[in-house]
Amino acid sequence: MQWRRAVAGLVVAVGVVGLFVTGVGWNEVLEHVRAAHPVTLAGALVAGLGMLALRGALVKRLLAPIDGAASGTTFATAYLSGYFARSALPWGRSTGTPVMAFLLARDSDSEFEDNLAVVAAAEGFNLVGSLVLAGIGIAIFATVGGGSIDTVIGSLAVAGGGGLLTAGALVVMFNRGVARRVSFGFAARCETAIGSLPRLPSVEGHLTNRIDGFFGTLEAIQASRRTLVAAFGIAVASWLLNALPLYFGLLALGVDVPLALVLVCAPLASFGGIVPLPGGSGGIEVVLASLLVATAGVPADVATAGAILYRLTTYWAHFAISGAVAVLVSVFGTKPALPIDRGL
């Protein structure tokens, strides 16, 4: 049933993108896509794959304090299988997080709550990295671009302000223990309620111990300055590689948009992923094309073609690779084939 829902969601996502392209001009957009320079487009694909590798490196780095965490081929297959769930499920950043944590825990000697804390922290670093890169891009464009950036500033203020407010609230909650106290209280009440039911085994301490492990892992990450610096650097670098496919995709269409502007548009477009479709399909394409039209003066059909190429070399390429790994894992199992993998 879950596979059917995922497939149905993907069909709807493709349909929404198709409606968007039709509204702009199907023939015009398709003509631009077909005329894209293949070598430059290959550069976009390479950058997109580099971004996927860095996202995995971020999770791997945050797993360092976890005893018995997945490593080597085991980590790679679990991470990519989880990334497939993240890509295939609506609101994948939220719904895919526990799936990835479960797979990382299942294929290792670590606990689910520890991996959940790591994956959630990685999503937080990615959010901060996107806002930092957008800020860098707008600073560079304002300094040397010489163009109007009113639309960019407005978009950055809305998206960045909301993102920073959310991130700040989470930091305050974690540092002051608000989230921990609330979670413990809720879990304790649940344990009491379940324990009062007849014919059910006692679960006293089960939920609270899990929550304690979750917050303990977050505290371990927070206590390591080296881990924080490394994770922040990887997150920003991954977003740089996430923006380059847009730059190369536009070059493949013969459009030379300032790189600084691309560094702003790519992160801001990710906020279009709020739509409840796999990978934010439809929303991201619309937001990205609109930003290119409003800020760079790119014609609507060319901007839409650029958005399509960008998504093909990032989201859909990642979806294909992680999906292939997920299928192989489901067919052949999760244990590494080579003994040397356990030493990686």
Whereabouts are the PLM-identified features?
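Transmembrane alpha-helix interface/packing and boundary motifs in multi-pass membrane proteins
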Residues: 47, 83-90, 250-252, 266-281, ...
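Alpha-helical transmembrane segments and their immediate interhelical loop/hinge regions
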Residues: 203-253, 259
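Transmembrane helix-loop-helix hairpins in multi-pass inner-membrane proteins
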Residues: 1-31, 85-192, 281-344
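Membrane-embedded helical hairpins/re-entrant loop segments and their flanking transmembrane helices
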Residues: 54-81, 250-264
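Membrane interface segments of multi-pass transport proteins and intramembrane proteases
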Residues: 67, 172-215
